[in-house]
UniProtKB/Swiss-Prot annotation:
Residues 12-136 form the MH1 domain. Residues 188-226 have a biased composition (Low complexity). The keyword Protease does not apply. GO terms for cellular component: cytoplasm; heteromeric SMAD protein complex. Pfam families: MH1, MH2. This is Mothers against decapentaplegic homolog 1. GO terms for biological process: anatomical structure morphogenesis; BMP signaling pathway; cell differentiation; dorsal/ventral pattern formation; embryonic pattern specification; myeloid cell development; negative regulation of DNA-templated transcription; regulation of DNA-templated transcription. May form trimers with another Smad1 and the co-Smad Smad4. Its main location: cytoplasm. Keywords: Cytoplasm, Developmental protein, DNA-binding, Metal-binding, Nucleus, Transcription, Transcription regulation, Zinc. It comes from Danio rerio.
Length: 472
């Protein structure tokens, strides 16, 4: 269908607004989204004119263009629902936009989505895309002056060995994660002392940052992603500053070093570089690996229990995988995986959203560190909930600290770069399964960027003072 025939049944106002549409795909979906918006804006005097002014003069100041907030915050387009500001930012600015986590409201916006007011601003130029943070290089000393007697390893590692429970502790989202407003009072989780260097929110306070729904893509959109669940909690929007870094690219990943660092001869800077595949995912049944590793090149990945004959590179379909040793428990569990989990990587952060009707269970040391939980804690994510499971910036800070404490301290961080996740069945102190290898269906996620960064840092550090082994 060409553009002329497509527009033959559209109103002049919709035609005009579609003239500013970005991207070439899903013309019909964009038309329906704009048509739904026009019907709402016609009820407000001057709203259409203000939107056209914003779209035609993107560099000029413009007023909020609002529509009423629905009960669940979502807008239905083509029988599916999405968050309104995401839908129209996708239509008019960023066709590849996947989630509301990628957007921040500008200071000039009076009705940002996150403010929970009765009206929502959908002016695409009142939002800015979240940029991946530029991670500072790790400075590795060229000459080792490390004194083993002054090692922090006893504090860094021994607590893990001394307080390691017979099986992992458990936490449930959102019950175990206090949902506090921004600038809330500090909290101390009821879990054993973290074995990592003091976490940012262990005794210093934390704000829950897990909205009920991270995704706002849907099968009616250009991305063929699932329907957006309603957001149950979102922190207030933080004002955007005008000096944010531009979207991450390979040039920004190795930024120009300050003169005082570049002139130093006693350190070797090791910069973070974004890999071609941000993660690999391996599927297991009990303690048996099944199938080949899935390499994630897209920032948005679905891991589900279905089959996909089209071999979509954004989907890892576990239903395709066969295993001659599969028992009835595994078969039954696989039937309940359903829509599975949505993993996505944005702004240097990894999120997991449970799309399955059954809960998923996640063991992420980075997430546990952030919340002050014991490193091996297993977090339950119920259906239609999401959780941030890795933060590049916090990992960078830990790595920079650990370099000064020796090879072993840096090597210990490799455990943080692997995330384990089980479907339907959990494990840990509250379950009869003690280990993830006892769960019927689970995946292991390897984060390539952090792992490769660690490898480069360890290479610069040379050999360890104590041999690294499987029991070290």
């Amino acid at each position: 269908m060409n553009v002329t025939s497509l527009f033959s049944f559209t109103s002049p106002a919709v035609k005009r607004l579609l003239g500013w549409k970005q991207g070439d795909e899903e013309e019909k979906w964009a038309e329906k989204a704009v048509d739904a918006l026009v019907k709402k804006l016609k009820k407000k005097k001057g709203a259409m004119e203000e939107l056209e002014r914003a779209l035609s003069c993107p560099g000029q100041p413009s007023n909020c263009v609002t529509i009423p907030r629905s009960l669940d915050g979502r807008l239905q387009v083509s029988h599916r629902k999405g968050l309104p500001h995401v839908i129209y930012c996708r239509v008019w600015r960023w066709p590849d936009l996947q989630s509301h986590h990628e957007l921040k409201a500008l200071e000039c916006c009076e009705f940002p989505f996150g403010s929970k007011q009765k009206d929502v601003c959908i002016n695409p130029y009142h939002y800015k895309r979240v940029d991946s943070p530029v991670l500072p290089p790790v400075l590795v000393p060229r000459n080792s002056e490390f004194n083993a007697k002054l090692s922090m390893l006893p504090r860094f590692r021994n607590p893990l060995h001394q307080t390691e429970p017979p099986m992992p502790q458990n936490a449930t989202f959102p019950d175990s994660f206090p949902q506090q407003p921004a600038n809330a009072l500090p909290f101390t989780p009821n879990s054993p002392t973290n074995s990592y260097p003091s976490s940012p929110n262990s005794g210093t306070g934390s704000t829950a940052t897990f909205p009920h729904s991270p995704s706002s893509s849907d099968p009616g959109s250009p991305f063929q992603m699932p329907e957006t669940p309603p957001p149950a909690y979102m922190p207030p929007e933080e004002p955007m500053t005008q000096d944010c870094p531009q979207p991450m690219d390979t040039n920004l990943l190795a930024p120009n070093l300050p003169l005082e660092i570049s002139n130093r001869t006693d350190v070797h800077p090791v910069a973070y570089q974004e890999p071609k595949h941000w993660c690999s995912i391996v599927y297991y049944e009990l303690n048996n690996r099944v199938g080949e590793a899935f390499l994630a090149s897209s920032t948005s990945v679905l891991v589900d229990g279905f089959t996909d004959p089209s071999n979509n590179r954004n989907r890892f379909c576990l239903g395709l995988l066969s295993n001659v040793n599969r028992n009835s428990t595994i078969e039954n569990t696989r039937r309940h995986i359903g829509k599975g989990v949505h993993l996505y990587y944005v702004g240097g952060e990894v999120y997991a959203e449970c799309l399955s009707d059954s809960s998923i269970f996640v063991q992420s040391r980075n997430c546990n560190y952030h919340h002050g939980f014991h490193p091996t804690t297993v977090c339950k994510i119920p259906s239609r909930c999401s959780l941030k499971i890795f933060n590049n910036q916090e990992f960078a800070e830990l790595l920079a600290q650990s370099v000064n404490h020796g090879f072993e301290a840096v090597y210990e961080l490799t455990k943080m770069c692997t995330i384990r996740m089980s479907f339907v069945k959990g494990w840990g102190a509250k379950y009869h399964r003690q280990d993830v290898t006892s769960t019927p269906c689970w995946i292991e996620i390897h984060l390539h960027g952090p792992l490769q960064w660690l490898d480069k840092v360890l290479t610069q550090m040379g050999s360890p003072h104590n041999p690294i082994s499987s029991v070290s």
